[in-house]
Amino acid sequence: MKLRGRKVVGGKAEGELIVSKKPLSFLGGVDPETGIVTDAESDIRGQSIAGKILAFPRGKGSTVGSYVIYALKKNGKAPKAIIVGEAETIVATGAIIAGIPMVQGIDVSKLKTGQRVRINADEGEVEVLDG
């Protein structure tokens, strides 16, 4: 299955998906030292986003969340790429400063944790490789 969205940050990545059906706050919601989701309201609480393709509907919370994304990258705990339904300023800025490929305009309800995907953010494409 191929899904088409729009580029926020260019680049390519392939890997395992971790999908949240809820908006995600990076400040106080993701530990920048470990990449573990700590937000008590998150449906992926306790799971690591490190080295995975992270998909969620949109970001929420403080603008400091952008710097949490940057810290995740500097600590080697960032996702390989980000897929969102709606790219709001916090997550988009974080992906830009961290150099993480990002695509917006994707219906994340069509994606499942554990699937393998290939992202060509330059073209706004997300391809599900299995399941």
UniProtKB/Swiss-Prot annotation:
Key words of the record: Isoprene biosynthesis, Lyase
Record keyword Protein transport present: no
Pathway assigned in UniProt: Isoprenoid biosynthesis; isopentenyl diphosphate biosynthesis via mevalonate pathway
Pfam families hit by this protein: AcnX_swivel_put
Biological role: Component of a hydro-lyase that catalyzes the dehydration of mevalonate 5-phosphate (MVA5P) to form trans-anhydromevalonate 5-phosphate (tAHMP). Involved in the archaeal mevalonate (MVA) pathway, which provides fundamental precursors for isoprenoid biosynthesis, such as isopentenyl diphosphate (IPP) and dimethylallyl diphosphate (DMAPP).
Subunit structure: Heterodimer composed of a large subunit (PMDh-L) and a small subunit (PMDh-S).
Protein name from the UniProt record: Phosphomevalonate dehydratase small subunit
Organism: Thermococcus gammatolerans (strain DSM 15229 / JCM 11827 / EJ3)
